[in-house]
Each structure stands twice: as structure tokens, then as C-alpha cells.
Amino acid sequence: MIILNYNKTFFLKSISNISDIQIEHGIEIAFIGYSNSGKSSAINALTNQKKLARFSKTPGRTQLINLFQVTSDFRIVDLPGYGYAKAPLLIKIKWQNMIYSYLKNSRSLKGLVLLMDIRYPLKILDQDIISMALNCKIPILLLLTKCDKFTINNQKIQFQKVYEKLDKFLNELHIQLFSSLKKIGIEKLKSKLNFWYEKYR
């Protein structure tokens, strides 16, 4: 298997609309999740760069899409966090339409990393994203983030609950525990991204 050096990942650009990516070559893996799911922390942990993905002081405030270059033909797409309660309804609708259009129409998107706080998994919008991705034949890696908040035993219990709810989708969806703080699951995340890169490039 190809082993990529994620430490060399660099910021490419920010855009306000997914149609502005305007890059036809290579493959993309998108990171998506609620505003407080630990998305930025996961990208920083993956790349071993503390400030690559910037944190917003107000969750959900940033509506920009951030692109990061891993190799010349492999990009990470950091989609805006969703579910921010104070976001205007029109913004929420626009976001949902944009995401569905991206999942359905992007030729470069080959995988989706969906991040969920292990304490509050499978909220309504998480389930919507899973349905959208599966309908569009996009494979999913589901990270149960902040697992360090639980004891090892409770991690296993929560993992099993999520596993059972998604049991019928496990051919297209993989679930794993993750903690940016304790460095849990980072190597498995790299392995999955390497697998997608080798399979689809």
C-alpha cells in the first residue's frame, strides 16, 4: 500500500462555494461534521500541524470551504461545520443544497470522513449526510471523536450502539474511535486515506 506523508500537507485556498473548486484532476476526500465535532483538530492531528486548520471562536460562524493539498493529485476538502443553532434558515438550506450537489456531481470526491462527537452520535443532520453519501455511492469513514472523554469500557459500549444502528450499511461505511488529544485512531485514519488514494487515483 502507498504510504503518504501527511506532514507535508499545506493550505491551498478558501472558497465560499463548492463550485469554485475548479480543479478537475486528482482525488478529494471531504471532512464533514457538526461545528463542534472536532473537525479542525482531526485535520491538524492527521497532518501533525497545530495551526493548519484554523479554529473558529464561534462554532458554525465560518462558512468557507478550505482546501488542503496532500500531494499534487490528492486534496482534503474541509467543509463548513453544520448544525449551528443561530445560523439563519436560508444559510442552512443553502448549505444542505450545496453539500448534496457536491456529493452527487463531484468527479474528484472519492471518500467522506464524517466526524461525530462520541457523546452525541447520529444526530439528524449526521443521518442525513450518511443517506446522501450512500445514495451517491460515496464511501464513508465515520470517526467517533473525543473518545478520550469516555473510559475504555464506555467507548466500547458507545461504539457498539452506533455499530448496531448502522449495521446494514457497513459494506459502504467504516466506524472507528478517534481522539485528537490522545492521538487515538490517527494511524487508522491515515491508512484509510492511503487506501482510498491508492484505489481511486
Curated annotation (Swiss-Prot):
Mention one GO biological process in which this protein takes part, according to its record: division septum assembly
Q: Which GO terms describe its molecular function?
A: GTP binding; metal ion binding
Q: Which UniProt keywords apply?
A: Cell cycle, Cell division, GTP-binding, Magnesium, Metal-binding, Nucleotide-binding, Septation
SUPFAM superfamilies, alphabetically? P-loop containing nucleoside triphosphate hydrolases
What residues bind Mg(2+), as annotated?
40, 62
Q: Which InterPro entries match?
A: G_ENGB_dom, GTP-bd, GTP-bd_ribosome_bio_YsxC, P-loop_NTPase
What's in the GO CC field? cytosol
The residue range of the signal peptide is none
**Co-factor(s):** Mg(2+)
Q: Which residues form the EngB-type G domain?
A: 25-199
State the protein's purpose. Answer: Necessary for normal cell division and for the maintenance of normal septation.
UniProt lists the family membership as follows: Belongs to the TRAFAC class TrmE-Era-EngA-EngB-Septin-like GTPase superfamily. EngB GTPase family.
Q: Could you tell me what this protein is called?
A: Probable GTP-binding protein EngB
Q: Which organism is it from?
A: Buchnera aphidicola subsp. Schizaphis graminum (strain Sg)
